[in-house]
Amino acid sequence: MKPFVIAIDGPAASGKGTLARKIATHYRLRHLDTGLTYRGVAHALLQQKLALNDEKSALAYAKKLDFNTLKPALLSSHELGEAASKIALIPALRDILVAKQRDFARIFPGSVLDGRDIGTVVCPDADIKFYLLANIQTRAKRRYQEILKKGAQADYHEILAHLEQRDSRDITRTQSPLKSAQNAHLLDTSELGIEATFKIACALIDPIIKAHIIE
């Protein structure tokens, strides 16, 4: 049976990661936050005090990166997110990680992948695709509150500026720019909580996953 794949894309702080985890738990599917794969490489470079534009080292770390060792708690900092978005501009690095992400989707009977190019590049043939969006003020507020909950200090306006820069990098990069797949379900989470978003997504997934099982 062909693996069942759910693709979830969207900009930073749109809620895609939280939705992906809830969906994976609900349907008992494997989950991959593809952003962590870029963060993992960025973390390795910074740990060795190497420049983020050190392409040779970045490619070497990407090739030997074991997705099973990626720890969200270790890789979730804002600084690593910024670093990851910068190394993601390296075409050869994206090629390596995209190939490994596709392998992940092939290996397991069912999986949920979230990122910025899942429905368009990594898994264009995914069984169902979602694209989450929210206005930038809402996303900045979410990120601000996330940081405060961790006991760290944060500046809302600084976060807003960083998100604007991140969106610009993601949307304008030449390889795998952030955009919605033509056949993706658009979910605007600006006014939606995670539970409401989850219910909408499940209502769309249920008939498709049932049909897949019957096949």
From Swiss-Prot:
Q: Could you give one GO CC term from the UniProt record?
A: cytoplasm
Main location per the UniProt record: cytoplasm
Keyword annotations: ATP-binding, Cytoplasm, Kinase, Nucleotide-binding, Transferase
- Record's keyword annotation contains Transferase: yes
UniProt-listed GO biological process terms: pyrimidine nucleotide metabolic process
Catalysed reactions listed for this entry: CMP + ATP = CDP + ADP; dCMP + ATP = dCDP + ADP
Which Enzyme Commission number(s) are on file for it? 2.7.4.25
Q: Which GO terms describe its molecular function?
A: ATP binding; CMP kinase activity; dCMP kinase activity
Q: Which HAMAP family match?
A: Cytidyl_kinase_type1
What is the protein named? Cytidylate kinase
Point out the gene that encodes the protein.
cmk
